[in-house]
Amino acid sequence: MEVILLEKVRNLGNLGDKVHVKSGYGRNYLIPQNKAVFATEQNIELFEKRRAELEKKAQQNLANAEQRAAKLNDTTIVISAMASDEGKLYGSVGVNEIKDALIEKQIEISKREIVMPEGPLHSIGNYVVEVHVHSDVVANLQVEIIPAK
């Protein structure tokens, strides 16, 4: 299936690229999320007319993402969790706990944006967690896990 991307999609292409994707990915994700349209002659003409508007919107999204990243880079969250005397947690600190701690600080974020490639955190200490606020912008969030009293 051929589609035209209406915004930059990670590991796929940039705004305006005509790409070939599997039909399920196109129909079930890209098109419903308004990230792409079918690559018909009519849609290609419509896209060329709207290209400047879409590029301006993409620049605004990038600027907003950079502001959010700057705010997240300056943020340190402290999470209190039950732990043994050796510093091992009873359970773990994952994406949901980090998201909840950020919401308490009035920082809106989705679970999809938080990336923990090594999995949940299992011990007390200081960690750096990546937050992908945009396909081009990555923030580093400081997470401190302390033992609950």
UniProtKB/Swiss-Prot annotation:
* InterPro entries in alphabetical order: Ribosomal_bL9, Ribosomal_bL9/RNase_H1_N, Ribosomal_bL9_bac/chp, Ribosomal_bL9_C, Ribosomal_bL9_C_sf, Ribosomal_bL9_N, Ribosomal_bL9_N_sf
Stored Pfam families: Ribosomal_L9_C (PF03948), Ribosomal_L9_N (PF01281)
* Molecular function, one GO term: rRNA binding
Transmembrane portions of the chain:
none
> Which cellular components does GO assign to this protein?
ribonucleoprotein complex; ribosome
Q: Which domain of life is it from?
A: Bacteria
Q: What family is this?
A: Belongs to the bacterial ribosomal protein bL9 family.
Sum up the protein's function in the record's words: Binds to the 23S rRNA.
Name assigned to this protein: Large ribosomal subunit protein bL9
Protein's organism: Legionella pneumophila (strain Lens)
